[in-house]
């Protein structure tokens, strides 16, 4: 896994390219990723960097975590995440330092992970795009029901994984191969072409794309 950043989804807007095209972009604030720990093969069995993002009141931090952050000399954040890196990259970082937008460049392909918007309890039409039943012609009470969910005596049960009504959204999802359209280094913003998971102010993880294709 490559070194990435934790950020906050600010919202969406549109920008104009040099060719005059208007493209939709998502604004992601990725400033002040503070390094809380650097893990190595010798001490932890693997190499990684641990970072925190955002701000949290001291009264809302547990004593073990407060001690961990105090040892690193950083302020408490809303979220802590790890990025697996190689030993050479880990040697360039130091506890108490910070990471910012200079990890990325305009035109680079990235993967963005976030928690999707929760929709609550949803029916099969909204959840799985089932077709509605007939409005008339003998259909009186089965307009938006899923229909048959299995056979009768044999096998006499509903198979696991059957698509039915249930909770929709509020799950972790990753959108791959998004393009960085613009970088505002002064305000520590990434403008990502297209949409990313989550609601406004939701936390996201931005990493270099794992499936990026080399330019011809």
Swiss-Prot record:
Methylated by PrmB. The modification N5-methylglutamine is found at residue 153. SUPFAM superfamilies: Translation proteins (SSF50447). Keywords: Methylation, Ribonucleoprotein, Ribosomal protein, RNA-binding, rRNA-binding. This is Large ribosomal subunit protein uL3. Residues 134-153 are annotated as: Disordered. One of the primary rRNA binding proteins, it binds directly near the 3'-end of the 23S rRNA, where it nucleates assembly of the 50S subunit. It comes from Cupriavidus pinatubonensis (strain JMP 134 / LMG 1197) (Cupriavidus necator (strain JMP 134)). Belongs to the universal ribosomal protein uL3 family. GO terms for cellular component: cytosolic large ribosomal subunit. One of its GO terms (biological process) is translation. InterPro entries: Ribosomal_uL3 (IPR000597), Ribosomal_uL3_bac/org-type (IPR019927), Ribosomal_uL3_CS (IPR019926), Transl_B-barrel_sf (IPR009000). Coiled coil: none annotated. Pfam families: Ribosomal_L3. Part of the 50S ribosomal subunit. Forms a cluster with proteins L14 and L19. GO terms for molecular function: rRNA binding; structural constituent of ribosome.
């Amino acid at each position: 896994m490559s070194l990435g950043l934790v950020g906050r989804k600010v919202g969406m807007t549109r920008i104009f390219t040099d060719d005059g095209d208007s493209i939709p972009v998502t604004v992601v604030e990725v400033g002040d990723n503070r390094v809380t720990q650097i893990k190595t093969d010798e001490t932890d069995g693997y190499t990684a960097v641990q970072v925190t993002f955002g701000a949290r009141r001291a009264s809302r931090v547990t004593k073990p975590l407060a001690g961990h952050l105090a040892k690193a000399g950083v302020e408490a954040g809303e979220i802590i995440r790890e990025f697996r890196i190689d030993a050479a990259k880990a040697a360039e970082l130091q506890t108490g330092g910070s990471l910012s937008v200079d990890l990325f460049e305009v035109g680079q392909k990235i993967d963005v992970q976030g928690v999707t918007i929760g929709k609550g309890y949803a029916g099969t039409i909204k959840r799985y795009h089932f077709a509605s039943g007939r409005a008339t012609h003998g259909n009186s009470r089965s307009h938006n029901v899923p229909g048959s969910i299995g056979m009768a005596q044999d096998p006499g049960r509903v198979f696991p994984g059957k698509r039915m009504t249930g909770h929709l959204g509020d799950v972790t999802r990753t959108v791959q191969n998004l393009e960085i359209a613009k970088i505002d280094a002064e305000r520590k913003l990434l403008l990502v072409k297209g949409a990313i998971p989550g609601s406004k102010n939701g936390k996201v993880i931005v990493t270099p794309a794992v499936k990026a294709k080399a330019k011809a």
